[in-house]
Amino acid sequence: MFHPYRKTLLSGTVALALGLFATGAIAAGFQPAQPAGKLGAIVVDPYGNAPLTALIELDSHTISDVKVTVHGKGEKGVPVSYSVGKQSLATYDGIPVFGLYQKHANKVTVEYTENGKAMKEDYVIQTSAIVNRYMDNRSISDLQKTKVIKVAPGFEDRLYLVNTHTFTPQGAEFHWHGEKDKNAGLLDAGPAAGALPFDIAPFTFVVDTEGEYRWWLDQDTFYDGHDMNINKRGYLMGIRETPRGTFTAVQGQHWYEFDMMGQVLADHKLPRGFLDATHESIETVNGTVLLRVGKRNYRKEDGLHVHTIRDQIIEVDKSGRVIDVWDLTKILDPLRDSLLGALDAGAVCVNVDLEHAGQQAKLEPDTPFGDALGVGAERNWAHVNPIAYDAKDDAIILSSRHQGIVKIGSDKKVKWILAPAKGWNKQLASKLLKPVDSKGNPLTCNENGKCENTDFDFSYTQHTAWLTDKGTLTVFDNGDGRWLEQPALPSMKYSRFVEYKIDEKNGTVQPLWQYGKERGYDFYSPITSVIEYQKDRDTIFGFSGSINLFEVGQPTIGKINEIDYKTKDVKVEIDVLSDKPNQTHYRALLVHPQQMFK
């Protein structure tokens, strides 16, 4: 028979024993890392997203005049040095260390002032290997290899962030279910809609001029290819630096802000009426962010609702609320097909079809809805990739791969169009820029864009139509569909880095600078890519993201270049090789640690 007193006594004894055990466990708990020097402990990868970063904790010290140097590895290693400002010290409660090598005992020197006394300390920071979580039988390598071809004196300190990707074993798994036609039966399959299948794992890193990885964004930061969750799927693109030294980016149904320490500062879902963000995010001088998206449940003239493809620009504030919308289906002409029918069927942006490479695309009236080449809001008619913001008149400049380069004001009126004349309706044709030579004399060009007795050329299937601080426009001219046709042989194609001067008052365009045509097919990059003028070294930086794309079974080359503006000499050339064959890269950009830790 169970005695109530014995039960109480037993319960009390057990409770006392557990209490003593718990108290002992707390008293004997594992200790935190102890100070590594005169400051605090070192924490590698403090936010869990950037394993080649670390923090030296302040441990309640008040310091200033901070400088960090991550020493190069071996005799030829590239040191990474930068100052750390008051704001960064307060933000991280420590000294941010950027530019570590993977799986290496990194030598780091920190200089600072405390209580008026100059201090200098040396540390050794151990890192682990970085890991590609998406490998399969197609993998050529675990990480994307690099090949340094040339680095001129004076450019050794350059660091390049590569925004590329790797195929997942399962491929694209999702699509939006579109609205059925009114004549469709109950059991008839619904059509695809939107661009949800645009889904691939990110591969984001910084490379130095020795070809070494010096930063890595963990693939799980924004993406999860192992879970059926569309909020963690998409295509991480449009990584652009803000004035604060942070970065914005888009992926699928979200847009983000993060820093180089791996801290995610903002994670916003797209506003309710929009979906499928890819290609671009850019912060304006007003502190707002421009995003390239599609429209959810767009109603066509026949009453059918569709999700549009890459033809909407939204401006959002830092809380994610919509400030403005540019609906290109109403501003441009979604039925213009002059370039669409001239494209290489083997590659439309990052959608690659090797079996039809080199063949001219055929536009069929019954082309399926969704992310398919064709006219109408329900198809990939515009394909806007990068965006530029012109603060002088509060306007945007869009690179529409399938239409041309267009400047549009905040009033939604087209200011000018840079494209061949063929196929534009009367209203838009009046906005076409007229080509002129260096003296302002008109050039003779046919409607397909072929010009006589000049080296002027329009850009075709272009990327990154960005403004320079000189007021000129730099464009990566991919060159597919040049003169609105496919050449007799694919090897006749070429890509260019181009600079144009736009005279908005007179409606003219003048060629100023070009590079790449002379390098021929070996330099041809049919899709993606970027160029940008670099004032600090007077160079044109370029990343040709899809060289070698159609060579079956071979890695695709993403070629990093800096070209001297005056002489056109190659100052930097580094190849990035995809880890799986025929897998394109997207973009790259220069990063400056001095600007990231103010």
UniProtKB/Swiss-Prot annotation:
GO MF entries: aryl sulfotransferase activity; arylsulfate sulfotransferase activity
PANTHER family registered for this protein in UniProt: CYTOPLASMIC PROTEIN (PTHR35340:SF10), PQQ ENZYME REPEAT PROTEIN-RELATED (PTHR35340)
Entry EC number(s): 2.8.2.22
Chief location category: periplasm
Protein's organism: Lelliottia amnigena (Enterobacter amnigenus)
A GO cellular component entry from the record: periplasmic space
Top-level taxonomic group: Bacteria
Function: Catalyzes the transfer of a sulfate group from a phenyl sulfate ester to other phenolic compounds. Is able to use several substrate donors and acceptors in vitro: using phenol as an acceptor substrate, 4-methylumbelliferyl sulfate is the best donor substrate, followed by beta-naphthyl sulfate, p-nitrophenyl sulfate (PNS), and alpha-naphthyl sulfate; using PNS as a donor substrate, alpha-naphthol is the best acceptor substrate, followed by phenol, resorcinol, p-acetaminophen, tyramine, and tyrosine.
Catalyzed reactions: an aryl sulfate + a phenol = an aryl sulfate + a phenol; 4-methylumbelliferone sulfate + phenol = phenyl sulfate + 4-methylumbelliferone; 2-naphthyl sulfate + phenol = phenyl sulfate + 2-naphthol
pH profile: Optimum pH is 9.0 using p-nitrophenyl sulfate as a donor and phenol as an acceptor substrate.
Subcellular location: Periplasm
Annotated family: Belongs to the aryl sulfotransferase family.
Signal peptide stretch: 1-27
Top EC class, one word: transferase
Protein residues bound to 4-methylumbelliferone: H279, H383, H463
UniProt-recorded name of the protein: Arylsulfate sulfotransferase AssT
Disulfide bond entries: C445-C451
Listed HAMAP family: Arylsulfotrans_AssT
Record's subunit section: Monomer.
Keywords annotated in UniProt: Disulfide bond, Periplasm, Signal, Transferase
Active site, UniProt feature: H463
